[in-house]
């Protein structure tokens, strides 16, 4: 078959396959056109679930006679004219495909009148070439679109329509979503001559909750928490149901709008779900009606045929913004106090450790304790320094302090006789700055290492905590602060505020920058190791810790933070283990020479080898 240009009707029918899925799709496209035309009242008449008739009447600006024929042509629109317009769309429609596609699979009639015309005009397209006929008609200012016999000329598509009740329920849901997007528009919906829905316009400054209750039900309204959250060009408004009262019925209420456009966006849903996860069960879903306003240049709506999805240019920023907005209103409603009492603190949020392989956990012990001899004896050059004492040593072991510590560890201790080397210790007691080669991951969080024929197990979570403490502890210069895209604002008591002000200089050395006013504190920057943490939980716990202290030493604060950071790895991979050990060897060379308890355990394979040889 030779290459040829498709006839207009066939081309439009192909496009209709994407745009017109069912009668509800037609209603959505036509009502959005009415909203773009500035309508304040829209009447929707449906017969037989939309298969027989869909009539949309509005009081918008109307269409001029000269433009009626173009309105039914494909890729004809008044909403964009250049690429710049496409990259900053503010209208609901913009492709110019809807009317042409709908008219190709139905008998469509368009009647319209503008305010400066004396009479109305009616247009309809028919025939193989979709020729448009225009004739005079009687009609007030505005537009009426009638769609008769949907899919009459595509029997295969018509066969897939569901029952009349099911199709109307889909239309009803579309109108609910649109009514929640535009409180300023009156929308009436009727089916088979009976009025089903009447959504009256809410005057400016009026009670939007009345329409919210009519659409989402009184149960949602009773447990709805209002959200008003803003940062830069981002604004989040709306309501989220209290997760403590979420039911399967309420969980069906998940409406999200981006610049007034109804969306089904996984990124937004994930941010909301993450904010509510501590209050929801594994099989529960949050209920919400949220409106996100964003600079049109920062969002691409031209990524889905039916415009159900969008793509954000700064998706991480949008995700964190929504997450913090929802979490903030939930915390304000719950009024969770900061941990200032004498109740026992929760255990550090880390993955379970292989205690048999890792030995004692120094981070689970008090910061001040008697020195404990290291699991591996240090080399003579180390001066016999107890390994368990240097986590509290000052200054800390930042990257720039590595050379200083190497010199300290290599300073010979006077009047000390060298020890006879033990069989399995030269690999760690020598001057080498490497743990060895990673062979595999054992028990999900331990690395099996080999060096010079000696095998050992290394507890990766413990190594990760030592590394974080090294990264957090300031040396000659303060730790580099990383500004937050969205500053974290928390309510604090007078005691907490006083403790923060006393610890401000110490926190600044750790890279934590904040500003306090009245009853609130705003965290503006944190060090790099804290960027991927849940700051909504960690920072209040840190404030609670500081409120109990009388002396604020950066090293002690860094050690507390390192103990309470959440591990980023539930299941370690070889690549992650190799990267971690490389960082530890670079920033904490002392761990290689003098491994602290709980970090490294030698594995003696000789008995197993001997047993195999004896068989």
Curated annotation (Swiss-Prot):
A GO term, aspect molecular function: ATP hydrolysis activity
Single biological process term from Gene Ontology: mismatch repair
Gene3D superfamilies, alphabetized: 3.30.230.10, Histidine kinase-like ATPase, C-terminal domain (3.30.565.10), MutL, C-terminal domain, dimerisation subdomain (3.30.1540.20), MutL, C-terminal domain, regulatory subdomain (3.30.1370.100)
Keyword DNA repair part of the UniProt annotation: yes
Alphabetized UniProt keyword annotations: DNA damage, DNA repair
Sequence segments annotated as region (Disordered): 362-397
Name this protein carries in UniProt: DNA mismatch repair protein MutL
Species whose genome carries this gene: Escherichia fergusonii (strain ATCC 35469 / DSM 13698 / CCUG 18766 / IAM 14443 / JCM 21226 / LMG 7866 / NBRC 102419 / NCTC 12128 / CDC 0568-73)
């Amino acid at each position: 078959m030779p290459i040829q240009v498709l006839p207009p009707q066939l081309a439009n029918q192909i496009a209709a396959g994407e745009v017109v899925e069912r009668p509800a799709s037609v209603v959505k496209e036509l009502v959005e056109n009415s909203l773009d035309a500035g309508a304040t009242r829209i009447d929707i008449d449906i017969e037989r679930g939309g298969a027989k008739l869909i009539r949309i009447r509005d009081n918008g600006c109307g269409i001029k006679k000269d433009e009626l024929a173009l309105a039914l042509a494909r890729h004809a629109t008044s909403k964009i004219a250049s690429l710049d317009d496409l990259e900053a769309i503010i209208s609901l429609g913009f492709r110019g495909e809807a009317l042409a596609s709908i008219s190709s699979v139905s008998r469509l009639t368009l009647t319209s009148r503008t305010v400066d015309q004396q009479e109305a005009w009616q247009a309809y397209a028919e025939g193989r070439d979709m020729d448009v006929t225009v004739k005079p008609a009687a009609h007030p200012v505005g537009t009426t679109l009638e769609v008769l016999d949907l899919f009459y000329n595509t029997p295969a598509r018509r066969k897939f329509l569901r029952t009349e009740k099911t199709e109307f329920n889909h239309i009803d849901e579309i109108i609910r979503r649109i009514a929640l997007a535009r409180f300023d528009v009156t929308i009436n919906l009727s089916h088979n001559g009976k009025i089903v829905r009447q959504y009256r316009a809410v005057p400016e400054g009026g009670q939007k909750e009345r329409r919210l209750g009519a659409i989402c039900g009184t149960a949602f309204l009773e447990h709805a928490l209002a959200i008003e959250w803003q940062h830069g060009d981002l604004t989040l408004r709306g309501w989220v149901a209290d997760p403590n009262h979420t039911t399967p019925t309420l969980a069906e209420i998940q409406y999200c709008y981006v610049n007034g456009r109804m969306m089904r966006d996984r990124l937004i849903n994930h941010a909301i779900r993450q904010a509510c996860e501590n209050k929801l069960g594994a099989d529960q879903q949050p209920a919400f009606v949220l409106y996100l306003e964003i600079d049109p240049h920062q969002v691409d709506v031209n990524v889905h045929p039916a415009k159900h999805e969008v793509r954000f240019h700064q998706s991480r920023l949008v995700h964190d913004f929504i997450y913090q907005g929802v979490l903030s209103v939930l915390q304000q409603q719950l009024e969770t106090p900061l941990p200032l009492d004498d109740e026992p603190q929760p255990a550090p949020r880390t993955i379970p450790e292989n205690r048999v392989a890792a030995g004692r956990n120094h981070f689970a012990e008090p910061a001040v304790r008697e020195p404990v001899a290291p699991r591996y004896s240090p080399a003579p050059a180390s001066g016999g320094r107890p390994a368990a004492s240097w986590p509290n040593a000052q200054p800390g072991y930042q990257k720039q302090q590595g050379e200083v510590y190497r010199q300290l560890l290599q300073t010979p201790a006077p009047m000390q006789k060298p020890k006879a080397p033990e069989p399995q210790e030269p690999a760690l007691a020598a001057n080498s700055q490497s743990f060895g080669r990673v062979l595999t991951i054992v028990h999900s969080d331990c690395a099996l290492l080999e060096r010079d024929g000696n095998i050992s197990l290394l507890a990766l979570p413990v190594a990760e905590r030592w590394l974080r403490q090294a990264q957090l502890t300031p040396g000659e210069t303060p730790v580099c602060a990383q500004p937050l895209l969205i500053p974290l604002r928390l309510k604090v008591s007078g005691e907490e505020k006083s403790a923060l002000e006393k610890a401000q200089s110490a926190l600044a050395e750790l890279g934590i920058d904040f500003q306090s006013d009245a009853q609130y504190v705003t965290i503006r920057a944190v060090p790099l190791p804290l960027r991927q943490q849940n700051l909504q939980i960690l920072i209040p716990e840190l404030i609670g810790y500081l409120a109990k202290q009388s002396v604020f030493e950066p090293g002690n604060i860094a050690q507390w933070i390192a103990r309470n950071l959440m591990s980023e790895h539930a299941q370690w991979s070889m690549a992650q283990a190799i990267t971690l050990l490389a960082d530890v060897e670079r920033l904490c060379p002392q761990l290689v020479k003098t491994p602290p308890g709980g970090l490294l355990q030698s594995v003696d394979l000789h008995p197993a080898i001997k047993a195999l040889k004896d068989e």
